[in-house]
Amino acid sequence: MSSENCFVAENSSLHPESGQENDATSPHFSTRHEGSFQVPVLCAVMNVVFITILIIALIALSVGQYNCPGQYTFSMPSDSHVSSCSEDWVGYQRKCYFISTVKRSWTSAQNACSEHGATLAVIDSEKDMNFLKRYAGREEHWVGLKKEPGHPWKWSNGKEFNNWFNVTGSDKCVFLKNTEVSSMECEKNLYWICNKPYK
């Protein structure tokens, strides 16, 4: 084949009117088009696999967030059927807690709790105590323990205190913070903590 014929054959796709086959039907170009769909299909499969792995990872992370909670979770216990803590109340150990953001005297705080069907916090267990100390932080919060002259300590729900923890100080009303449980004059204005059982 002469150099002229090669030139014409190579450029035939540029001049289909010259009677030569264009590149769409030329066997010379057919190998270039045979694999053209294989690359996009492979990319699509890889994208689907990547997206699937990404979705699985996101689901695993979101499930892990709920299955690996911190030390204190504020969810209903497994034997409860209905969540019943009001807005701004925190659920823990079958009780709803309200931690105030304003200060009042012990009696005024007890009245505020009563308006919500609660009492100043009654602490029944070491778990409750640790939870409340951690929640209270460095601020002093009234709890529902009070001592009238000549009488034993009593909780705001009327139950007698069994002295399972130590109360420092010699005043009549009890507060707690993260490092201590102590007594103070009842007229002092402090934050307070209410609690009531789940409904």
Swiss-Prot record:
Organism's domain of life?
Eukaryota
Task: Tell me where in this chain the C-type lectin domain is found.
Answer: 92-195
Annotated region described as Disordered, given as residue ranges? 1-29
- GO biological process assignments: cellular response to xenobiotic stimulus; negative regulation of T cell migration; negative regulation of T-helper 17 cell lineage commitment
Q: Which Gene Ontology cellular-component terms appear in the entry?
A: external side of plasma membrane; plasma membrane; protein-containing complex
So which tissues is this one expressed in? Expressed on the surface of activated T-cells, B-cells, natural killer cells, neutrophils, eosinophils, epidermal Langerhans cells and platelets.
Protein localization: Cell membrane
InterPro entries membership: C-type_lectin-like (IPR001304), C-type_lectin-like/link_sf (IPR016186), C-type_lectin/matrix_domain (IPR050828), CTDL_fold (IPR016187), NKR-like_CTLD (IPR033992)
Positions in coiled-coil regions? none
Q: What up-regulates or down-regulates this gene?
A: By antigens, mitogens or activators of PKC on the surface of T and B-lymphocytes. By interaction of IL-2 with the p75 IL-2R on the surface of NK cells.
Q: Which GO terms describe its molecular function?
A: carbohydrate binding; identical protein binding; molecular sequestering activity; transmembrane signaling receptor activity
Q: Which cysteines are joined by disulfide bonds?
A: C85-C96, C113-C194, C173-C186
Glycosylated residues (UniProt)? N166
Q: How does it assemble?
A: Homodimer; disulfide-linked. Interacts with S100A8 and S100A9. Interacts with galactin-1/LGALS1. Interacts with S1PR1; this interaction mediates S1PR1 degradation.
> What's the stated role of this polypeptide?
Transmembrane protein expressed mainly on T-cells resident in mucosa that plays an essential role in immune cell homeostasis. Rapidly expressed on the surface of platelets, T-lymphocytes and NK cells upon activation by various stimuli, such as antigen recognition or cytokine signaling, stimulates different signaling pathways in different cell types. Negatively regulates Th17 cell differentiation through its carbohydrate dependent interaction with galectin-1/LGALS1 present on immature dendritic cells.
Spell out the protein name for this chain. Answer: Early activation antigen CD69
Q: What is the lineage of its organism?
A: Eukaryota, Metazoa, Chordata, Craniata, Vertebrata
